[in-house]
């Protein structure tokens, strides 16, 4: 089964919901993966996307930072997500399609300007996250 998939580091899904609607209308991918949603799941404006035919969503989120979501025209189910590096940062979600295909959506922050684990905690966290992938 062929399908189209788009991915977008949205940097706040609520702030850019109108742009998401434009993308869904003009490009109409079957599946859209969003990173850095910066929103608790219950605050994602799913109803706006559902009105455009994207009736399925799986997501992980938290207020103010990180967060990932998968919007789909096709039926998907929540197949979990890993807590890489034990950070509890809502950076990974898995959607499973009816045919068993799994879509993994990750948000991996840049890790800061100093590429040194000792001098930059965030860089060390990024290395730990990537190692566990």
Say what each PLM segment does.
Residues 22-24, 91-99, 130-133:
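Short amphipathic alpha-helices and their capping/turn segments at secondary-structure boundaries
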Residues 28, 74-75, 131:
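Generic low-complexity, intrinsically disordered sequence content enriched
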Residues 18-21, 72, 84, 116-119:
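Surface-exposed beta-strand edges and their flanking turn/coil or helix-capping segments
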Residues 37-40, 44-113:
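Structured beta-strand-rich core segments of catalytic domains in phosphoester-bond hydrolases
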Residues 1-52, 58, 66-68:
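N-terminal, active-site-proximal structural segment of metallo-dependent hydrolase catalytic domains
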Residues 15-18, 128-132:
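Short, contiguous clusters of charged residues that form electrostatic/catalytic patches at enzyme active sites
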Residues 7-13, 81-83, 123-127:
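Short, flexible loop segments at the rims of nucleotide/cofactor-binding pockets, characterized by
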Residues 109-130:
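Surface-exposed cleft-lining segments at the edges of enzyme active sites
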């Amino acid at each position: 089964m062929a399908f189209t998939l788009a991915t977008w580091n949205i940097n706040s899904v609520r702030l850019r919901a109108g742009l998401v609607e434009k993308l869904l209308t003009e490009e109409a991918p079957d599946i859209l993966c969003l990173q850095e949603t910066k929103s608790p799941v219950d605050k994602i404006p799913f109803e706006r996307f559902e009105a455009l035919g994207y009736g399925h969503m799986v997501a992980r989120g938290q207020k103010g930072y990180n967060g990932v979501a998968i919007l789909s025209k096709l039926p998907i189910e929540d197949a979990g997500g890993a807590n890489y590096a034990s950070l509890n940062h809502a950076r990974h979600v898995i959607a499973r399609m009816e045919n068993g295909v799994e879509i993994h959506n990750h948000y991996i922050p840049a890790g800061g300007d100093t590429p040194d684990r000792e001098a930059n905690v965030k860089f060390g966290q990024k290395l730990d996250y990537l190692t566990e992938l």
